[in-house]
Amino acid sequence: MASVSELACIYSALILHDDEVTVTEDKINALIKAAGVNVEPFWPGLFAKALANVNIGSLICNVGAGGPAPAAGAAPAGGPAPSTAAAPAEEKKVEAKKEESEESDDDMGFGLFD
């Protein structure tokens, strides 16, 4: 879990990026001081140097895109390979369930202007 100091620097960097201002140590310090947060003096410089050559916008868009996920139909080691004919049938079942759930929401009486 991130400390308060780390979070203050992260939020400061995000605010600066949102305002399309370059992220520098002085600007991070100014935002932290304005927020009234006590931060160890090395954090703003560390974050400013770490984000100097990084496209923050692409970082935001790629959060959670860690690495390749294993295939959904992968067989356990030594087991038989799964049949490929079962995959389209499963997709049709999922689509049918989605359609049913969307239709059932209409009958709940949660309409805004009913």
UniProtKB/Swiss-Prot annotation:
<feature type="modified residue" description="N-acetylalanine">
    <location>
        <position position="2"/>
    </location>
</feature>
<dbReference type="InterPro" id="IPR027534">
    <property type="entry name" value="Ribosomal_P1/P2"/>
</dbReference>
<dbReference type="GO" id="GO:0005925">
    <property type="term" value="C:focal adhesion"/>
</dbReference>
<feature type="region of interest" description="Disordered">
    <location>
        <begin position="69"/>
        <end position="114"/>
    </location>
</feature>
<dbReference type="GO" id="GO:0006414">
    <property type="term" value="P:translational elongation"/>
</dbReference>
<protein>
    <recommendedName>
        <fullName>Large ribosomal subunit protein P1</fullName>
    </recommendedName>
</protein>
<feature type="cross-link" description="Glycyl lysine isopeptide (Lys-Gly) (interchain with G-Cter in ubiquitin)">
    <location>
        <position position="93"/>
    </location>
</feature>
<dbReference type="GO" id="GO:0022625">
    <property type="term" value="C:cytosolic large ribosomal subunit"/>
</dbReference>
<keyword id="KW-0597">Phosphoprotein</keyword>
<keyword id="KW-1017">Isopeptide bond</keyword>
<comment type="subunit">
    <text>Heterodimer with RPLP2 at the lateral ribosomal stalk of the large ribosomal subunit.</text>
</comment>
<keyword id="KW-0007">Acetylation</keyword>
<dbReference type="GO" id="GO:0003735">
    <property type="term" value="F:structural constituent of ribosome"/>
</dbReference>
<dbReference type="GO" id="GO:0006412">
    <property type="term" value="P:translation"/>
</dbReference>
<keyword id="KW-0687">Ribonucleoprotein</keyword>
<dbReference type="GO" id="GO:0005737">
    <property type="term" value="C:cytoplasm"/>
</dbReference>
<comment type="similarity">
    <text>Belongs to the eukaryotic ribosomal protein P1/P2 family.</text>
</comment>
<dbReference type="GO" id="GO:0002181">
    <property type="term" value="P:cytoplasmic translation"/>
</dbReference>
<keyword id="KW-0689">Ribosomal protein</keyword>
<feature type="modified residue" description="Phosphoserine">
    <location>
        <position position="101"/>
    </location>
</feature>
<keyword id="KW-0832">Ubl conjugation</keyword>
<dbReference type="GO" id="GO:0005829">
    <property type="term" value="C:cytosol"/>
</dbReference>
<dbReference type="GO" id="GO:0030295">
    <property type="term" value="F:protein kinase activator activity"/>
</dbReference>
<dbReference type="Pfam" id="PF00428">
    <property type="entry name" value="Ribosomal_60s"/>
</dbReference>
<comment type="function">
    <text>Plays an important role in the elongation step of protein synthesis.</text>
</comment>
<dbReference type="GO" id="GO:0022626">
    <property type="term" value="C:cytosolic ribosome"/>
</dbReference>
<feature type="compositionally biased region" description="Low complexity">
    <location>
        <begin position="69"/>
        <end position="88"/>
    </location>
</feature>
<feature type="compositionally biased region" description="Basic and acidic residues">
    <location>
        <begin position="89"/>
        <end position="100"/>
    </location>
</feature>
<feature type="cross-link" description="Glycyl lysine isopeptide (Lys-Gly) (interchain with G-Cter in ubiquitin)">
    <location>
        <position position="92"/>
    </location>
</feature>
<dbReference type="InterPro" id="IPR038716">
    <property type="entry name" value="P1/P2_N_sf"/>
</dbReference>
<dbReference type="GO" id="GO:0043021">
    <property type="term" value="F:ribonucleoprotein complex binding"/>
</dbReference>
